[in-house]
């Protein structure tokens, strides 16, 4: 998305956003696209600074015209194999591509339109500070109820839950808790792992994966490049 600077008429840097809908759109007619946007705000020199593009998107009104480009890249595409297992690790608005995946897998109207009929296991690890920050919760609970054999949903709510050491519960703590089951899936060549959210989540996930792999007698520093080379490790952080 390209926005022009009102002070000099020149365009700002292009902003990339993950698409939160399938190619059929939320209305299943193929003429809409959905985004998941949180307005960026930060303090600088005693002033509150608003992010340029996120503020623009949050302030536009129904009927306003917006020029966009894309889609860009193939990093986060789902595999063609209907029997693939999909492990998703997300924080905040990083839920966007995961929402698109889960709609494609489990939304009834979407399944009717797809030649691709998901039969594998989907496991979403979602990190948020509070329960109120969890997005698309109603849809996720519906998928859990309708597809209990195919969908698992694990939440890490840092300000409401505690980890095993009594500290705040983060997504990497949930990964460590689920080490055995998670790496049983990863050892299956049909399993793909998708990571999306703030770049700061990567070190914690790597540390958790290292511990989890060790419990299975595996070396994560060797395994991760192998997964990447095989096209099974997908990362989109910002």
Model feature map: region roles:
Residues 97, 102:
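Phosphate-binding glycine-rich loops and their immediate beta-loop-alpha structural context
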């Amino acid at each position: 998305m390209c926005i022009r600077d009102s002070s000099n008429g020149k365009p700002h840097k292009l902003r990339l956003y993950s698409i939160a809908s399938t190619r059929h759109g939320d209305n299943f007619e193929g003429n809409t696209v959905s985004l998941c946007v949180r307005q960026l705000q930060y303090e600088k020199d005693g002033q509150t600074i608003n992010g340029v593009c996120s503020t623009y998107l949050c302030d536009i009104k129904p009927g306003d015209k917006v020029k966009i480009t894309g889609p860009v890249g193939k990093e986060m595409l789902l595999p063609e194999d209907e029997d693939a297992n999909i492990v998703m690790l997300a924080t905040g608005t990083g839920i966007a591509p995961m929402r698109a995946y889960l709609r494609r897998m489990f939304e009834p109207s979407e399944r009717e339109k797809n030649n691709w009929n998901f039969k594998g296991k989907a496991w979403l690890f979602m990190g948020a500070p509070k329960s109120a920050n969890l997005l698309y919760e109603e849809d996720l609970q519906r998928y859990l109820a309708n597809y209990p054999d195919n969908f698992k949903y694990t939440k890490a709510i840092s300000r409401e839950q505690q980890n095993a050491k009594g500290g705040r519960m983060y997504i990497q703590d949930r990964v460590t808790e689920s080490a055995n089951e998670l790496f049983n899936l990863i050892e299956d060549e049909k399993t793909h792992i998708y990571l999306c959210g703030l770049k700061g989540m990567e070190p914690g996930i790597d540390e958790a994966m290292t511990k989890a792999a060790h419990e299975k007698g595996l070396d994560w520093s060797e395994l991760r490049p192998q997964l990447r080379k095989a096209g099974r490790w997908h990362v989109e952080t910002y």
